[in-house]
Amino acid sequence: MEEVKILNPFDQNVIETLPFEDEKSVFMKLERAHQLFQDHRKQLPKYERIQILERLAEKISADAEYFAQEAAAEGGKPIADSRIEIARAIDGIKIAIRELCTLKGEEITMGITASSTNRMAMTIRQPRGVVLAISAFNHPFNLIIHQAIPAIAVGCPVLIKPALTTPLSCRSIINLLHEVGLPKDWCQMIFCDNTVTGKLVSDSRVSFLTFIGSEKIGWMLRSQLAP
């Protein structure tokens, strides 16, 4: 199995070595996420999602310096910048909680035709399915929060592909989510090459793609999405 050395860009020291996942492993994760979403008995009620996100914010706040040091090491950034990044990530989680508390459907006006008299109609917001989040290297902690937390908040399983040079912050976030009560298949990291990623993007089980990166790559990935 091929391995990837995670380097500190500042001094080129090896921080850790992670194994590449093969195509079979990646698509097994996709299938688990898809089956999870299809099983309505396993949907997480809104109050549980809120509690999970609240505990996540508390955990990150308690160990903020550790996560800042980790992001700085794998990203090669000044520690001051990474500390700001972690603070922004915590704010991002709190914003998701606030939005979740106010997210609602709409009542549709009835009684304007004879057939709609004495009737009520409304819209209800529902999660759309499995989210694939392809992230970038420059803010490895906060960008994952921006992409994954909204998906989890509204009840969508999410697969996260971090930048190959900065996967450690992503792994830490996912471990924390599992630690505070999110079932494992709701949020999974995939660490694979671009060929496997391209096949994943075009799979019909992916309901939504969130991508952070160049315009060129973004439009290319968009063109590969399943109808």
Regions found by a protein language model. Give the residues of each.
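Conserved hydrophobic/aromatic pocket- or pore-lining residues that grip, position, or stack substrates
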Residues: 49, 71, 93, 131, ...
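Hydrophobic packing residues within well-ordered alpha-helices of enzyme cores
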Residues: 93, 170-173, 200, 221
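Active-site-adjacent beta-strand anchor residues
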Residues: 19, 134, 159-163, 190, ...
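Short alpha-helical
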Residues: 24, 62, 66, 77, ...
